[in-house]
Amino acid sequence: MSHRGSRVLRLDALARVEGEAALHLTVHDRTVAEAQLRIYEPPRFFEAFLVGRGHGEPPDITSRICGICPVAYQMTACQAIERACGVTVDGPLAELRRLLYCGEWIESQSLHIHLLHAPDFFGHPSAVELAREHRGAVERGLRIKQAGNAIMERLGGRAIHPINVRLGGFYRVPAPAELAPLAERLRRAHDDALETVRWVAGFDFPDADYDGPLLAMRDPGRYAIDSGTPAVMAAGAGSDGAPVRGFPVAEFERHVVERQVPHSTALVSELDGHHYLTGSLARYAVSGRWLHPSALDAARAAGLGDPATGAVCRNPFRSIVVRAVEVAHAVAEALRIIDAYEPPSRPYVAVPPRPATGCAATEAPRGLLYHRYAMAADGTLTLARIVPPTAQNQAAIEYDLRRQVQSRLDGPGEPAGDEELTALCERAVRNHDPCISCSAHFLNLTVERG
């Protein structure tokens, strides 16, 4: 195949990601000149919608940003506004919130592992073809996902866009007897989750390495989900006990700066002037030592090293293994919360408004999610700022694409054709599990060769 002159290849949509976008790849003389992730969905203006609304409305409004991870938006919005109002939610209410968040982690990560990501490792175009060859694995993944959905339905009222979450807690909290059936289901899901780790650990992983900074929440003593402070592992740091640098969430916007680029309706983020990665690989690097013991053992057996001694995984293709370990952890954590549950004396604490600004960050399944709100004395919102994980990862995805395509072009064998490069780019993007709708939806691919 000749690659002289310009070559253009377009796909209407990238399968197995949430949303739509385009990728523009420019290659000159076997050198990648440019890789652009073009997010072209119309801006959704959620931040503008929130201005002028009451301070109790963001949990319901922001949950509509994403149908896969609505709890992340609800929890982060609640914490930011509660912080502005000087209110702390702790005890059983905080544990119930963490349980709800575990439910979302379980369902979202299981969906990505089994339906979106795993088909790539078998050369299948979708989970339907994968199920013909590995029916038991796909059914196992669906059982795990259903267990996560059951938590969200019980605590949130429904699995998609929960309606039981409010400032200060919940509209209604469950009795212990209502959580007992969840525990039985989760015990089965825990066995399934550990088996999933063993399954994905046996995949064939291409060599790859993301050498940029990693950003995740850090909550010493436990794996950060709904709490902690932002922490950074430096670029290039590996499994050598590399130090982690933290900063207060109130300083997030001093370190993470968003900028507009012509080719995307999502803002592109930089951490202290550099592209960076948030999500499962970052969480594992920053907090892996605090995984549940069963998840720790599974990580070691899966070849991820020993997170208790600071093991780091920087191969984006192996992110599927880290996500499977996180599912095992979330199931075990959910069981811990249910087993220790004592109902709170009331379903929520009052959150009276005051003129103030508050910010918060939590770990959505796809990475760190940041919210900031300002309000007037009557609770009317005067400012809303939301920085979703996929928008933060956009520059890192483009960097990763350039490196992986360049590695293939430099490799031995026949020159890579457009079809092969397209498949490689799609896999590379799916490694990061982007939720493109949250960020502003992949793949129109344009390859220019000259």
Regions found by a protein language model. Give the residues of each.
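A translation/RNA-centric and nucleic-acid-associated enzymatic feature enriched
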Residues: 366, 370-373, 382-383
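Active-site bordering "gate/hinge" segments
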Residues: 1-368, 388-450
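Active-site catalytic microenvironments in core metabolic enzymes, especially phosphate/sugar-handling
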Residues: 379
